[in-house]
Each structure stands twice: as C-alpha cells, then as structure tokens.
Amino acid sequence: MSRLLWRKVAGATVGPGPVPAPGRWVSSSVPASDPSDGQRRRQQQQQQQQQQQQQPQQPQVLSSEGGQLRHNPLDIQMLSRGLHEQIFGQGGEMPGEAAVRRSVEHLQKHGLWGQPAVPLPDVELRLPPLYGDNLDQHFRLLAQKQSLPYLEAANLLLQAQLPPKPPAWAWAEGWTRYGPEGEAVPVAIPEERALVFDVEVCLAEGTCPTLAVAISPSAWYSWCSQRLVEERYSWTSQLSPADLIPLEVPTGASSPTQRDWQEQLVVGHNVSFDRAHIREQYLIQGSRMRFLDTMSMHMAISGLSSFQRSLWIAAKQGKHKVQPPTKQGQKSQRKARRGPAISSWDWLDISSVNSLAEVHRLYVGGPPLEKEPRELFVKGTMKDIRENFQDLMQYCAQDVWATHEVFQQQLPLFLERCPHPVTLAGMLEMGVSYLPVNQNWERYLAEAQGTYEELQREMKKSLMDLANDACQLLSGERYKEDPWLWDLEWDLQEFKQKKAKKVKKEPATASKLPIEGAGAPGDPMDQEDLGPCSEEEEFQQDVMARACLQKLKGTTELLPKRPQHLPGHPGWYRKLCPRLDDPAWTPGPSLLSLQMRVTPKLMALTWDGFPLHYSERHGWGYLVPGRRDNLAKLPTGTTLESAGVVCPYRAIESLYRKHCLEQGKQQLMPQEAGLAEEFLLTDNSAIWQTVEELDYLEVEAEAKMENLRAAVPGQPLALTARGGPKDTQPSYHHGNGPYNDVDIPGCWFFKLPHKDGNSCNVGSPFAKDFLPKMEDGTLQAGPGGASGPRALEINKMISFWRNAHKRISSQMVVWLPRSALPRAVIRHPDYDEEGLYGAILPQVVTAGTITRRAVEPTWLTASNARPDRVGSELKAMVQAPPGYTLVGADVDSQELWIAAVLGDAHFAGMHGCTAFGWMTLQGRKSRGTDLHSKTATTVGISREHAKIFNYGRIYGAGQPFAERLLMQFNHRLTQQEAAEKAQQMYAATKGLRWYRLSDEGEWLVRELNLPVDRTEGGWISLQDLRKVQRETARKSQWKKWEVVAERAWKGGTESEMFNKLESIATSDIPRTPVLGCCISRALEPSAVQEEFMTSRVNWVVQSSAVDYLHLMLVAMKWLFEEFAIDGRFCISIHDEVRYLVREEDRYRAALALQITNLLTRCMFAYKLGLNDLPQSVAFFSAVDIDRCLRKEVTMDCKTPSNPTGMERRYGIPQGEALDIYQIIELTKGSLEKRSQPGP
C-alpha cells in the first residue's frame, strides 16, 4: 500500500519490529501544540523560582521525602519531585517574570490572588518504565503495539480483490465456505484474520440471529441458524451461547487460554449490533477479536451535528430550498444577534446521515443500495424468510460488499484525519464493552414490572374516583362554579323509549281480577307479620308475582333497538366508560388515563395557584383572574348566568387568594425549580446535546420571523402571543402570555412554559419535563381528597419505567453454561450451582456523534437510582460474577479541566494562571471560590443551576441559551430579568467582545476622522465597531467593508479560554490539541464559513475529552498486560470508566487506574507545552471497588421496586472507595503481583 498507515515517530521504530526497550527520558525541548503558544514561552526568560514581591511567602511544608512541596509561581502545588522527574525529566523552562506578573494581576482583578491553599501530602510512587523519549512517543508506541495486528488485518481487506458472490447460497445449519467457483463446503468457523460481517435477525422471533454473511480477502461465508433451517412448533426465548454465531471457537470445542486467542478483526456497519450475536464475545475473560465500525469512522470523517442532520434531511426531501438568505434577513440576523442564517451549504455535498445506503453513496457512489428486503426481517415471520431465502441472502451479501467498499475508502481517510495511533487503539478497545449480570437481572425485571403494574392500578383507581366524584357536581349545577370543570360536556342524554302500542281492552277474567286481600307491592299490609300463610294464600301470591313479571317483560318492547349508553350521565363521563357491548367492558370510567385532556381538570391541577386550562391553538396553559375588558362583551341585558357556560372567574380569584394565603404572602416570590433529568450533571447528563438544540432553536425561530416579514413587506405581523393592548395584561403576574385570542371572560390565558421556547405548545402537563415542577410545588393537584395528589405522585414514580421498560426488557442477555465459566468463578465460595451467570453486550457506537463520543440508548443514558422512581436501580443490576469485582473511577471535572488547561497554556503557560484555571485547580466549595459557587454568587442562582450554565458555556452555548435556561429554572422571571441575569453572567465569565481593526478599517477611521477609544493593545469595543461600520456604510453607498482583523474576549474569568477554543474552532482545519484529530469535514470552515460555531466550539472540548478516554484505555491495557492483571474493559459512561477484574487483582487494578490518570493528564500538559502537572488533578479522588455498577459505593439504591436496598434484597454489601494514599498503602506502591494483599 502506497500510503503509510502510521506516520513515523522520530527516534522510534514503527511496524512489526521490536518495540524499543523501556527507559527513562530527560525532556529537553517540549513541542507545543500551538506555534504561537510555544513561541511566546520560548521568548520568556528563564528565571529563578522566587518571583516578584507580590507573591506571598509560602509555608515550609515538607514532602514525604523530607523536602519542600513543589509549587509553581502562582502557589499551585505541583507533582512531587520524584514523579515530575520520572515523567517530564529534569530541568525544563520556567515562566518569565512578565508572564507571572500578568497572571497575578489577572487573579487579583477577580479576587482570587492570595487565597489560602490547603497543601496535599506528596505522592511518592515508582512508575513502570516508560517507552521512547517523551510522553507522546510512549503513548504512540503503546498504541502501535496494541493496534498493529488489527491494522495489518485491515490492510489485507484494503488490498484484497474480493471473490465474486456465489450463484446460490447453501441451506445448511452453521457456517459454509464458498470456493472460487461458488462450491459450498461446510466449515466450523471462518479461520480468517479479517472479515467484513453482517447479521440479520427476524425480529418477530426475538433477538436470536437468523442468518449472516461474511467475506474475507479469499472467500465468502454464510451462516444459518438452527431456528431457520429446522422447523419446530416453538423455541425457548432464553438465549444460550448455542444460539449464537461462532467466529473463534468451533461448536463443542473448549475455549482457548488467554494467550492462545488470535488477533482477528471484524468490520461492519453499526458493527456493535453484529457483535452482540457472536458467541465468544459473551465469555467472561474475553478474546482478542476487535471490531471496526464504518458508521463510527464516518461520524469522525464526515458526520453531521444534530442540527445539520435536520437540515440535511429537509434538503434531501426537497422541503428546504438551498439558497442564501436575503439581505434583509442577514441584516435582521445581525441585529438580533441570535446566530447567523444558514448561508453556506457546501457541507451538504461532503456529508450524509449514518445509514449504509447514504454512507455508500457518499464514499463510493454508483446506483443506490436496495433496502426493501430488509422489511421482511422487520415485519415478516420465519416462514417468510424461508420462502425468500436466496433473495435475502443476496441482500445480506450486498450489504457486506457495500460495507467493504466503504471501508476501503474510509480507513485511509480516517488515519489521515485521526493520525495518532491512540485514537484507533482506543476505539478498538471501546468496541468490546461488556456488562456481567446474574439471576438478579430477571428478578429486577419482574420486581420493576410488578411494582409498575400495581402503581398503575392504584393510579387508575384514583383517577376513576376523581371522575365519579366530579360527576356528582351535576346535582344543582355545581360544576358551573368549578374552576376546572366548567367547560366540559355536561349535556345529559335523556332516557328514551318507544311509544306503547295501543291494544284492545279485554274484559276482565277471573284470573285477572285483583285478589281480595292482596295489596300492591310496598303496601303496608305486606309489611305486617300475619303469621304463616295458608296454601291458598301462597297460591294467590304466586299468581300475582307471575302477573307482575309478565307485565314487566312486556315493557322490553319499549326499549330502543340499540341500548343507550349511560343515559342520565354527562357527556364527558360517558366517553370514559366502555359500552356494554365492548368485549373488554369493565364498570365505571375505566378508559380514563393520563393521556386524556380531561385528566388534568379532574385532578384540579394548578400552576402557581392558577387552574390549568386547555386551548386547541396554544395547548396547555392556565387561567389568571382579574381581566375586565372582556366582561363587557356580553349582549345588553344578558347576565352572566343566562349567557350559557361562562368561566367562573370569581371562583378562580378565590382559589388564587386562598393559595396566596397558604403560602403566607400576598404575592409569590421567585422560587427555583429542581433540575429536569436532562440537565442533571450525572453520568447520563445530556447537556452537551441540549446546548446545541436550544441554541439553534433561536436561529430557527428568528429565521421564521424573517420569512414572515419578507412575505408581507411593511405589513405588521399577525397577533402574536402577547397580542392586544398593554392594559390587558395582569400587573401581578407575568409568564408566557397573555394570549388574548383565548377570550375567556374575566381571565387571561398563559401558556405553560415549554423547554424549547415560548412558541412551542405543551401537549401534556404530565411530561417528564414537568417532574421538577411537581417536586417543587409549582404544579400541584388541587383540593378535594387525596386521589389527585396521589395520582400525581404515582405518575412521577412510574415515569422512568414507563419510558424505559421496553428498552430495558429487550436487552439481549445470554446465560453461560457452567462449562463456559472460568475456574475463578466456579471455585469461588459464593458460586451458586443453581444461579444464572451471563452478560449483556451494550450496543455501543464507538463514535456516535461528531465529537466522537460513544452512543448507546440504554446504558450510556441510565440515571442513578432514585427513591421515587420505579426501576431506576437499573445500573446496579450489572453485577460481577463470584471471584470478580468492578473497578472504576470518575474523572473529576474532566471537561472543565481540559478547557482550563487550554486557557492556561494560551494565556501565560502556567497551570492556574487564568481565573478559570485557578478556580478549577484551587477553588474550594467551602470558601465559595470554586467555579460553580462563583457563578452562583455572581448571578444569584443555586450552585446546581450554576453548574449547568458553566458547562453550557464551555460547550459553546451563547447568551440566548442562558436566558432560556434561566426562565426554565425559574419560570417566574420575566424575559427582561432573565436577559439581565444572562448578560451579567456572560460579562463576568466570558467577558465582552473586543475587536482589532484591519488595515482597511484603520484607513477608513483615519479618512473619515472617526473618534474611537482603544485599549492598550489597540482593541476597540463593540459600540465603536458598530459606529465605524455604520458610518463607512452610509458614506460609501452601503458598500461592504472588511474592517475587522481579529476578535477576542476580554475582562472575564474565562476570556482566555474562549479565545483559545475559538481560535481552534476557526482555524483552517480544526484539530484537537493533544491527539490532533480533525473535525468532521461537514464542520470545517471551508465548508460552513462562519456557521455552526456552537457545534465547533463544543467539538474542541468534547473531542478532547474523547482523546482523554482513548489515552486512558491504551494506558490501562498496557498496564494490565505488562503486570498480568486479570481484567477487561467493561464500559465508559461519559467521564467514568469501569473494568471487570479478578478479585485478587483488584488493588493492583486500582493503582493502574491512578497511574493511567496521572499519565493521561501529563500527556495533555506536555502537548500544550506545560512541563508539569498540579497535584490536585494528578490522581482520581477515589477509585471504586464494588460488586455492582453504581454511582457511589455507599449507595443502597433504594427505589419503589427495591424498597429494602441492594444489601438486604440482593446480598450486595457496600464497596470500597480508595484514594491514592490508601491504594499505595495496600499495594506498597507496586503493580507487581507479590504486592497484592489477600481478599
């Protein structure tokens, strides 16, 4: 192959040759990732450690070796001398005096300089020998060694001339190999180093694989399941390894030892789905097979952001005309400052969505792939597949061929755009996620579903009781004074009967004459006890009873042919009750559910004390009393009582007054809501996706407004949400409204706030976005018994399981027979012969977003256990088998530190030299000097909410996002108040934008004699820039001038960090600073111009975090292999990693994790030109050693479906959380096996 797959590393051998012998290095010159940063530091003088007089004297704190603790000139405690010399070598550049002075002034300005610091004990640790001449070469050599066998296998596929497809496919169970002429030969497994592979599953029959096709450089292969070839009445739904596809070990053969596994590569499109159906992947000890996903490589090369994906689909369907906006639209966009109009569409031609058909069209071209046969696997039965076997095998083979063609084009591109070998090695390791489970998984599913159904029944009964109680308001028309039920259908259906036929009177016969002494029913004579009846009296009574029954039977002819449905009941109630002829008939309003519009009314829901109301046009909102302008609209002489159904506004006023009295104040004060689930900063936090969605909604809404203005020039827009004169707004309440087109006498209508903005309607107040509002009391069930509040509480409790149970219950669990379990499990005292031991392979897309973050719908988004959420103990059901433990840790403030170190390297080349960096390293929550506390104090919000805004800014969100979020967190804020708070926050953190004029701009200022104020560096403010642009445009007949040469943020705690992020995002080819990965071609400036800045700034931090993870995975694999630690990678959830480790190796694995974190952080510092690392971020605050997967080892995970907790119900005790000092004590600071204490 003409292209070298890996670029050569200076001073290191590359390829299959021997890896250089490990050894220490002495760092001399350290390459900087940014030439300007490196130049600035090389120009700084090398000065002595003692700095200017402003620096306070440090206490003489001794290290464990008896020396002084190491500090940098800004009083940040650094690595111990021993660790520093092992990693960075001796010596190194010291920051210049000017840089230190500039940093001190900056920290003084933000009130951080001179804050006391708590010293940490030094960590003295002998690291394993490192390879190469520096950290970068160390990681390069490790990654090359780990990925080289797979890269060689990939090379075989790249250079191969594939054999032709066989003319017919063998109808035979198991694997079949096809020769050059198409001859079919049964084989146990495909003995190949590299395969392109595709599995198809008949979904109607469950998750068992149905058929598969593979191709190697030399032959085609097909596989058929026993369930396809052999017809049976039924098959078991429980999967075992025998149902899966063998790729490494023939059926019936024993598993090889760890050393005997061969390195093999499988390539596929969304290959994690195919991996889930491979037998050997479920073994506890794992194999050496690795997987390359063409879908993930596409995302890294030419993937789309979520907003771009929407635009791409719209353009593909012809719903969006690809043309630049009008001048009027551009002007309005600039004026609104909500984000640019989409003016560059070049990216449409170099990107696509993720489907194989579209990816093939992008990279290969040619006729489109035929995808219609796929529907048979989705909707058809096994019989349909048997009848169309040859066609479906050809379809599967076509996908394999297309995947190979895509792979041939992608891999060279991927290696060019992600040149560091750590990226590929990390993705290969990410592709073998593994979650061990046992019989407790089945118990969890049953308990959660049972609890859910029980609560559902209780909620149904509560709702039915509410409906029955509401029906009683018909008496005396009391419903007319009910703030919720007044506008329901209260019309009654009268009881109808046919007219009686006229019959000719017959003369009374003896038998029809009244019997003497027999009274009518109910006659007092009947009640009198006359003693025992005579035989004659008994006979007479029997005759009379038969006559009455005969008469009653005759009235059936008067009933209508179609029986009436609940006559005498109001219309809304009748709709909730099934008809008598319904096969599923049950008594009462059993059709009632939370999805019905009548339910919030029956529950008497209030929003801040105002009753909820539904509008066909605006969705759910609430009624605010006090409006008087529409009371006069009634016809003259008509009273409210005679006007028909009229809103009981006086009752609503009384309701709100009562609410205010209960609150103990006349008017409600602002109160912060809890966090919606997608904004909780837990391991499933989706904030990095929400930022882009919310930020671009502003762009979309503004574009729609411009289209409306352009459609009718000079014509005012139609009535908006706040249409109407100002005096029709309440003075004591503000919110999303009033919407005066909802004309309800005596009341204003306000919409419930929607997370996507005021223009969106709320379809249900029971949506999960309103759960925090239920918890903080904003959304409440009204008075009148406990049924309403209880139903609301139950809705909150079952929300998680209702939304997730299908995904959870459909997880593919494979139970292992005893013969497939390792000896460490079988011989452990806790092994249960009757128990079940198996695994789930989470179908992780290793690079599922443009930031190359992994994506998976269940496990990577699972929330932590909550006491009021059924089934939320999900993650704790991942439980290590006997003899094994789960070892892992969370990277502390990963993205904050990455952003901070980028800013520090850019500003003065010292850790903690910016306010943002200092707060990340030295800030203390107890003193209010950490980042989140500072933001909370500045804006006057809670610390939890401040976290969201801080992460949002780092992910590229602008001020509109902050305004939206402020109003979502505190819906009682006005738009103006939210804008002021957001402006205050961004001015204090991000700073203000300043501009440096271009040569053309300077010439215009001189020629036009325009007065502008400049800072010391020649920067001008936004106001002066607008003045220059306005005057030059006016005096040159609106000619466009390029007056800006450079933009920069100034004056905020995070200004330098944002300047660095934006400089990377706007560079010609943005690359991550550490591993040098390119941004997607669909977001390169040459394709998008100035568009999609949110996504691009977000990419810098998030993609660097992925670099961090890949470095960790490579380092952990090295240490596990080097020191024979028996363990395997399990899963990475955002900034958390977990490994499955033999019990006896757990402490060595914990030490390996700590060393991995140290080397990874040092790699970041080294690549940014910083020859040191602060002690506070060098090690994990704690490494968790546990038997199950949970956020904290002390969490008992009590939930409604697990009320007694993990220890009592499942027998899982609390785990261990060990810091670096405890781990060193347990392991004696060594990774060698002899250092490991007993279990």
Swiss-Prot record:
The keyword Magnesium applies. Residues 9-36, 44-60 have a biased composition (Low complexity). Changing residue 574 to W: In PEOB1; sporadic case. A motif (Exo II) lies at residues 267-275. Residues 43-55 are annotated as: Does not contribute to polymerase and exonuclease enzymatic activities. Keywords: Disease variant, DNA replication, DNA-binding, DNA-directed DNA polymerase, Epilepsy, Hydrolase, Leigh syndrome, Lyase, Magnesium, Mitochondrion, Mitochondrion nucleoid, Neurodegeneration, Neuropathy, Nucleotidyltransferase, Primary mitochondrial disease, Progressive external ophthalmoplegia, Transferase. Changing residue 853 to W: In PEOB1; with absence of progressive external ophthalmoplegia. Changing residue 499 to C: Decreases processive DNA synthesis. Changing residue 966 to R: In MTDPS4A; likely pathogenic. Changing residue 497 to H: In SANDO and SCAE. Changing residue 312 to R: In PEOB1; sporadic case. Residues 858-864 are annotated as: Trigger loop. It holds the Pfam family DNApol_Exo. GO terms for biological process: base-excision repair; base-excision repair, gap-filling; DNA metabolic process; DNA replication proofreading; DNA-templated DNA replication; mitochondrial DNA replication. A motif (Exo III) lies at residues 395-403. A motif (Pol A) lies at residues 887-896. Changing residue 943 to C: In PEOB1; likely pathogenic. Residues 1-68, 318-340, 506-531 are annotated as: Disordered. It catalyses: DNA(n) + a 2'-deoxyribonucleoside 5'-triphosphate = DNA(n+1) + diphosphate; a 3'-end 2'-deoxyribonucleotidyl-deoxyribonucleotide-DNA + H2O = a 3'-end 2'-deoxyribonucleotide-DNA + a 2'-deoxyribonucleoside 5'-phosphate + H(+); a 5'-end 2'-deoxyribose-2'-deoxyribonucleotide-DNA = (2E,4S)-4-hydroxypenten-2-al-5-phosphate + a 5'-end 5'-phospho-2'-deoxyribonucleoside-DNA + H(+). The active site is at 198 (exonuclease activity). Changing residue 627 to Q: In SANDO; shows DNA binding affinity and processivities similar to the controls. Changing residue 549 to N: Decreases processive DNA synthesis. Residues 510-571 are annotated as: Accessory-interacting determinant. Heterotrimer composed of a catalytic subunit and a homodimer of accessory subunits (POLG:POLG2). Interacts with TTC3. Interacts with LIG3. Catalytic subunit of DNA polymerase gamma solely responsible for replication of mitochondrial DNA (mtDNA). Replicates both heavy and light strands of the circular mtDNA genome using a single-stranded DNA template, RNA primers and the four deoxyribonucleoside triphosphates as substrates. Has 5' -> 3' polymerase activity. This is DNA polymerase subunit gamma-1. It comes from Homo sapiens.
